[in-house]
Structures are given as structure tokens and as C-alpha cells.
Amino acid sequence: MTLLALGINHKTAPVSLRERVSFSPDKLDQALDSLLAQPMVQGGVVLSTCNRTELYLSVEERDDLQEALIRWLCDYHNLNEDDLRNSLYWHQDNDAVSHLMRVASGLDSLVLGEPQILGQVKKAFADSQKGHMKASELERMFQKSFSVAKRVRTETDIGASAVSVAFAACTLARQIFESLSTVTVLLVGAGETIELVARHLREHKVQKMIIANRTRERAQILADEVGAEVIALSDIDERLREADIIISSTASPLPIIGKGMVERALKSRRNQPMLLVDIAVPRDVEPEVGKLANAYLYSVDDLQSIISHNLAQRKAAAVEAETIVAQETSEFMAWLRAQSASETIREYRSQAEHVRDELTAKALAALEQGGDAQAIMQDLAWKLTNRLIHAPTKSLQQAARDGDNERLNILRDSLGLE
């Protein structure tokens, strides 16, 4: 059994590739079923966010393992293998465990130490448990990563300042507009990122917020909290002209805001500027919108420059966090090795018990037939001894023939010989 982590993220792939490799929530079960149908895959978790798509797997080791999994990923998303290979990373066993712990702790995030990723990892794990988690080692790896992430946040200052993609989006808005108290903001979506954006905007006393979402009920809960108006996605075209700032983050597979829609809004606004921040993957806003005069479009990747200013205060904490991850990875791998030994011990004990039961049954049968008890017991003891020491004896003889003193010493130690 081998643990794997493979995927792409904001550091290895542009948004144009990430959106093609992402797994939409409504097709996740189908993807997991397809993944587990691969003969070498024993269990799997798919983590797909705006900044990363990763597969965490428990697999049987084989020569073409990497090729087979890359082929599956490309076939599933209809990708050219060369396009993916240049951006794909591959971590195995110790490195896979360390990678997941770093991801869950926010150490591999676009915003160092951001807390949302832990919730996303937990959701990915929960989704995989709906009939897709078939490997206890993989499950234990995720549970351990959750506790490590909690330890990192408790024992370091990695989360001391409120820095996130949502915070960066609001920072961008405040840099462009001197005051948010005179602007109207349209939020598209009502997920966790938009919730954070809405709360940041409320803290900065934005004049008006409008929330457009596919389901009104979810949006209304957020709107009641932050004092916003709720509209349907179908109303965006008509209401877009009211918005000075548009921040969008949905799970839609297709763009929600098109170039023509923005052109009409700008015309109604008499070309008064609009800021559009698209933090969705796949993108919610057609890239061509950025070519329009007075439409200033920023994607997730564009937020990197803003976010970089907030990293300095977290770097010292990150060093501490990396130490924790290294320690916890080492402990987990020791547990994993012990599990492997436990399985060997169980097999060895089962084998010995089978020999014992077989020979005992024969001895009891001989006694029932009136055989000499002392002779039967001596025969049982002799046969049991020979059967149990047969395999170790052959190993000792082979080690001696090979001149392998190290193996001889290990065998002597394991047999309790001084």
C-alpha cells in the first residue's frame, strides 16, 4: 500500500488550466466512482478549490502507476497529457503525508496561513466517506492532518492577522475606492468566500450590498447578517449597472457575467468605472471583460501581488509550523510502519495457530482411537516444534550461505537468541 498526493495548484498552474482540471460539486461522486474503479486505487479523496485540484490516494504500487493516474485525470477532463505534466506535482508516502498536513494548516495556500482551506479539506474528506473511503490508512492520514492544523493554529501565530483571498479582494476595493461608504457592491454567490467578503465589507461600512445567488434561501441568511439585498442570478443583467464593485465566487461551470452584459451596464452608468474581482475557478466573468474601457477585471491570480504584502508577519510563524508538520509527519510514518508490522504479526500468529490447531486435532483423534497418550503427546510436541521452526531455520541457513552477517544477527535477535 502506498499513499499518494498529486495535483496542481496556484503555484504550478495558471487559472486557465486550473479551471479545466477542477471537479464541480455535482459531479464529484461520479468522479470518485470513476477513480475508485481504477484497479490500483484502494481509496481516494478529491480536493478541488479555486486554487488547487488534488487527489489523495491509497494505491497498490506498480510500475505504471504514475502513467495510469495521469492518463485517468487527462481522460476524465479531456486534457492533453503534455499540458498537465508540466504543472503536475506528485508526492508519495512521507512526502504525501507532509503535503496534506501543510495544505490543511494553510502553509501551502495562496495566502499563507489562511483558515478556509481546513474547512475545504474537511469537506473533501467528508464527501469521500459517502462510499468512497476504503482505506483506513488514508482516513487516518486525514484525521491526523486535521489535528496537526489545529495544533499549528494553537501553538503559532500563523493566523494572527485576518488575511485571505476574501480579505485581499476587499483590500483591492479599498485601494481603488478611497471610501467604501459611497459605493454599491454586488456579490455573486453565497459560499464561504463570499460570506467572508461580505463581513469584511460590512466592517468597512459599504453603502449598499446586493447578493445574487442561485438559491435565495442561502443568500437570505447571509443578507440578514450583513444587511444586504438578495436577487436572483437572472437579475444580474438588469441590476449590474448599479454596482461599482462586483465580487464573484460561484461553482458555476460557465461564466455568469459576459462582455455584453458589462458593456450594457457601463453604457447605463455613462462609463463610470466598475471594479470586477473574479475569485471563482472556473471563472465567473468572461476574460474579455478586462479589455473594456472603464471595466477593471482582476482574477484570483491577480490578487497575488496584494497578498504578498501581508506575508512578512507570518513568516516566522510558518517556520514554527513547518517544524510541527515535520515532527507530526515523522510520528505518522512511524505509526504507518507499525501498522505494516502489525499485519505481518497477525499473519504470522494466524499461521502458527493454524499449525497448532491442525496438529492438536490429529493428536486428539489419535487419543480417541486408544493410542498411547505419552507417545501421542511426544509426537505432537516434536511435530509442532519442527513445523514452527522450519521457516526460521531455512532463513538462517540461507543467510549463512550468503555470508549475510547482518541478516543473521537480525534473525538471531528476532528469535530471542543471545
UniProtKB/Swiss-Prot annotation:
Catalytic activity entry: (S)-4-amino-5-oxopentanoate + tRNA(Glu) + NADP(+) = L-glutamyl-tRNA(Glu) + NADPH + H(+)
Record carries keyword Ion transport: no
Site feature Important for activity, where: 99
Domain of life, per lineage: Bacteria
Binding site for substrate: 49-52, 109, 114-116, 120
Cited SUPFAM superfamilies: Glutamyl tRNA-reductase catalytic, N-terminal domain, Glutamyl tRNA-reductase dimerization domain, NAD(P)-binding Rossmann-fold domains
Active-site residues, as the UniProt record annotates them: 50
Classification via InterPro entries: 4pyrrol_synth_GluRdtase, 4pyrrol_synth_GluRdtase_dimer, 4pyrrol_synth_GluRdtase_N, GluRdtase_CS, GluRdtase_dimer_dom_sf, GluRdtase_N_sf, NAD(P)-bd_dom_sf, Shikm_DH/Glu-tRNA_Rdtase
Residues that hold NADP(+) according to the record: 189-194
EC number: 1.2.1.70
Self-association and partners: Homodimer.
Further comment: During catalysis, the active site Cys acts as a nucleophile attacking the alpha-carbonyl group of tRNA-bound glutamate with the formation of a thioester intermediate between enzyme and glutamate, and the concomitant release of tRNA(Glu). The thioester intermediate is finally reduced by direct hydride transfer from NADPH, to form the product GSA.
Domain notes: Possesses an unusual extended V-shaped dimeric structure with each monomer consisting of three distinct domains arranged along a curved 'spinal' alpha-helix. The N-terminal catalytic domain specifically recognizes the glutamate moiety of the substrate. The second domain is the NADPH-binding domain, and the third C-terminal domain is responsible for dimerization.
Name the UniProt record assigns to this protein: Glutamyl-tRNA reductase
Organism: Escherichia coli (strain SMS-3-5 / SECEC)
Source organism phylogeny: Bacteria, Pseudomonadati, Pseudomonadota, Gammaproteobacteria, Enterobacterales
